[in-house]
Amino acid sequence: IVKEDNPNLMIITDDVYGTFSPHFRSFMAEIPYNTLCVYSFSKYFGATGWRNAVIALHEYNVFDRQISRLPKDKREALNHRYATLTLHPEKLKFIDRMVADSRQVALNHTAGLSLPQQMQMSLFAAFALLDKENKYKQKMQEIIRRRLQTLWDNTGFTLVEDPLRVGYYTEIDMLVWAKKFYGDKFVEYLKKTY
């Protein structure tokens, strides 16, 4: 699609579950020019909710290119918006604009994570890089598969194989489950009550 139909396609990918998939390869690795990647260490390291995440964008990217191609009046409006940050707001990278916008531009000097969060993410990243044989990754994938299978084994239904399944989440139709084990009357009760 990017090569043949839309070279200016902007792709935003959330790779948070990629580490749970044995053969995952990010769009960031394939088409970095077009991809903004969001990744969180939280689920992989059992720290869900701690907001240990990063946004990655290639130095040369379609987002910056498209901003530079905006009509003059739009570029001037953007230059005015970011003029408090730099003497050359027209050169401000898209990723820096995101940081500024996340802090409502005027509070940009407060941007970033706290030192404990930065240290924690640094340790998570170092740990992952030092695990050359991916033992932790394989263990996490095995735990997720085992938990998913245990859940489904206890529903009375068979989990259909899916080579693309990560298994961190699953959907169970509770009305189908209720009908199978408790009948239509219970299903009607659930529908009326919930």
Label each region the model flagged:
Residues 1-194:
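PLP-dependent class I/II
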